């Protein structure tokens, strides 16, 4: 699944630095606005101890991990939705991602070209721009409301418009799955799940004011605290290895995308597959190959904890822990799945 996390924020808050350390890249991360113009993209494998343990038990020759794509999007500024800076271009870049990592500077530095010292205020600047983008988009869609595809959603667009005008993000609006899917297909920005990346100073004393602000944010957002500012005497690689839990950030990004993992296990290969929570066995089959979905018969299901206890399929079968399920079975996180199908 080619799911993407977009890294956004004001200029010079650490977006490109975060992108570089997540993806082991070397894009420019300089102290002036719009250092990044075109979005940088890179793929990262998702850390998964379960996958490697299953592969070890099965003596697999090959291990294939799930992936998440990270996109480094240029800095937004106040007025971006009206075209300030290169705003419209950057906002459209956000529309192409599935989830948002919003980097916020949580330290003072007179050398940085961005004088705001309040992370909540900075978040609100970005939120206001993506809210206005969505208001503009919905107003344009109202002109197409006679289109059959939109007419039945007229009530929802009206609710969304009123919600946005109150300064609220649509990802906080209570929606059913069909409503959410419709809004996602419109590529609205505020419907996308968002995580705040709080870029703190290594100096804990200096962080006191900002930590108080972060504690306010935690009540509303998923928040990950990191330090992207390297002390002058430290070497970059050593500093990041000591101070940044990359595994945590990647796993939280995976969680933000609302994904589950299932596994196919064998001697030839053991592979993890990323699916949206709530995916049925029939739809998961298509992820492997469309022919498996077309010829779907049933699935054999083993849960991860049973594989760990009994070590191999023979013992699992003797223990009665292999379940047979049909096409409507909702796959759970950690399921080991064997698809039975006809060609």
Place the predicted regions along the sequence by residue:
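Generic structural "secondary-structure junction" signal
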Residues: 29-39, 46-48, 53-56, 78-79, ...
